């Protein structure tokens, strides 16, 4: 169990790095690009020139999408997803661990695997590969003039499912540890999922 808990800690550290640092920079970039879009649109109206471009508009929604794609695993780790817990809150740590263990194994893990499986072919084709595996010569682009390629943002869907799957595996390890009597893991999860009430 100690070896598995080391793996779980490594996955948790990676998830926290993505959720705390990478997404922070993406949020800042999204704000900058959004501000630029608004500024040049109004400036363009004022001076009667078209200054805005589909590149920046699409870049803004690509970045916005990436915040969510990269944040799913972080949400799972810190248990800040929507939960109807009028029963769950009154259960013992071990009972909660059993419910989370079974729920994660039966729902989240298969959902991630299915998501990756279903997404691989469209992403593969968007990079220009044909069904027989040969490269067709061009990647999928936005249908809008001056748009961005679609392949990179479609690839982020697979990355999101993979990160969520990794974190689900980490959670399963932690729940199994609680079930087998590792009380310190229950305390660790409680500390990670503590959300300060906003007043």
Q: Where do the language-model regions lie?
A:
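Alpha-helical transmembrane segments and membrane-interface helix-loop junctions
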Residues: 1-199
